[in-house]
Curated annotation (Swiss-Prot):
Gene: acpP
Modified residues (O-(pantetheine 4'-phosphoryl)serine): 37
Protein name: Acyl carrier protein
HAMAP family in UniProt: Acyl_carrier (MF_01217)
Lipid metabolism is among the record's keywords: yes
Length: 77
């Protein structure tokens, strides 16, 4: 089974239509990966579905980088 980090990166790559190599831990969804506000909402929904968790809106607003997404999912396990 893939690690949480690998799974998060795959979801980000697929949702934002970017190459997996571009999805580095320090990458910002908006500044580095070209996401807009709708992309980030869809990304949060995809993460919720993949990891069977709920991400409250106030937490979702803080998830702006690849590492922030990984950290949130790991802390919710």
């Amino acid at each position: 089974m893939s690690t949480i980090e690998e799974r998060v990166k795959i979801i980000i790559s697929e949702q934002l239509g970017v190459k997996k190599e571009e999805v580095v831990n320090t990458a910002s969804f908006v500044d580095d990966l070209g996401a807009d506000s709708l992309d980030t909402v869809e990304l949060v929904m995809a993460l919720e579905e993949e990891f069977n968790t709920e991400i409250p809106d106030e937490e979702a607003e803080k998830i702006t980088t690849v590492q922030a997404a990984i950290d949130f999912i790991q802390s919710s396990r």
